[in-house]
Design a protein with these regions (language model features):
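An N-terminally biased module of ancient metal coordination in phosphate/nucleic-acid-related enzymes
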Residues: 1-105, 110-113, 117, 194-203, ...
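Conserved, mostly hydrophobic/aromatic
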Residues: 18, 39, 125, 187, ...
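Glycine-rich nucleotide phosphate-binding loop and flanking beta-alpha elements
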Residues: 23, 105, 133, 229-231
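Short, well-structured secondary-structure segments
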Residues: 47-51, 126, 222-225
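Glycine/Thr-rich phosphate-binding loops of Rossmann-like dinucleotide-binding domains
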Residues: 57, 135, 233
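Extended substrate/RNA-proximal surfaces in nucleic-acid metabolism proteins
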Residues: 73-218
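Active-site-adjacent C-terminal substructures of enzyme catalytic domains
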Residues: 208-268
Length: 274
């Protein structure tokens, strides 16, 4: 049943709903047109560029490389380039110019201000949690195993990292980010990116995850069916997998397949993983 459901996401929608660009500081230098040509090559009918929204004012990027999001000065270039590609390829593929919004606990006002200013220009969007607030500051949960270890040390245990992550997802869902708040939740199990290094049976959190899924269902939101975890040596999992996927299917929560490509070559992984 699960495999049939996943295949339907690809075959009937033929959409990649999670793609980054050269405007992502931690991505490749492949330009937006490279991604478009790859999407056409692999038979997609629709694609969404979802570049990281700039971080809110006065928030210091916790990434050691300070490369979490697009620079605010580049938003107009991103939009203009996307619009040119929409026109150029309008007879071959539908191109959405969207955004991936980082929910950051305590910075809801700043995020809302950014969305109020730029949200009208985006036709697709993802709401994600990449950063969590610890006792000593903020951390990127997906940067490296070394950074992940620092989060464990700050919060006291791996168990508490999972607890904090899912609590932050709930905060993101319930937050008031204005009328342009994205309604698709990104890579729900991103906290498991380094599960090979930090193995953990998160079955105890299934009730909390079910609460998250119930909120998503009640709000009419979607899930980012993100396959990037399969490419990560420390993960080798879908970011919606196992019992979590079972519950999402049972609740009939819409999902949008996403390669989460930071390089054009990963567009093809939509088909390869099947």
């Amino acid at each position: 049943m699960k495999l049939d459901y996943i295949r339907n996401l690809v075959e009937f929608k033929r959409k990649d709903g999670h793609i980054h660009t050269q405007y992502c500081p931690h991505g490749s230098k492949d330009n937006m047109e490279d991604y478009v040509e790859e999407a056409i090559k692999y038979g997609l009918d629709e694609m969404s560029f979802t570049e990281h929204l700039p971080l809110p004012k006065n928030f210091e990027d916790p990434s050691p490389l300070k490369d979490s999001a697009m620079e605010i000065e580049k938003i107009e270039k991103y939009l203009k380039e996307g619009q040119l590609l929409q026109e150029k390829y309008k007879d071959k593929i539908k191109i959405n110019i969207g955004v991936e919004v980082d929910y950051i606990e305590g910075y809801e006002k700043g995020i809302k201000e950014l969305l109020n200013k730029y949200g009208v220009f985006f036709s697709d969007g993802i709401l994600s949690v990449h950063m969590i607030k610890g006792n000593k500051g903020y951390y990127c949960i997906d940067f490296s195993t070394e950074e992940f270890q620092k989060i464990i040390e700050d919060l006291g245990s791996l168990d508490e990292v999972y607890n904090k992550y899912y609590d932050t997802i709930i905060m993101a869902l319930e937050s008031d980010l204005g009328p342009y708040k994205p309604k698709r939740i990104g890579h729900l199990n991103l906290v498991r990116k380094f599960n090979k290094e930090f193995p953990y049976d998160y079955a105890k959190y299934l009730p909390k995850i079910e609460k998250i899924l119930n909120i998503i269902k009640e709000k009419g939101y979607e899930l980012d069916f993100n396959i990037a975890g399969l490419r990560k040596e420390g993960c080798r999992e879908l970011y919606v997998e196992g019992k979590v996927l079972d519950m999402a299917i049972e609740k009939e929560i819409p999902m949008v397949l996403g390669s989460d490509s930071h390089s054009a070559k990963y567009i093809k992984t939509l088909k390869e993983f099947l």
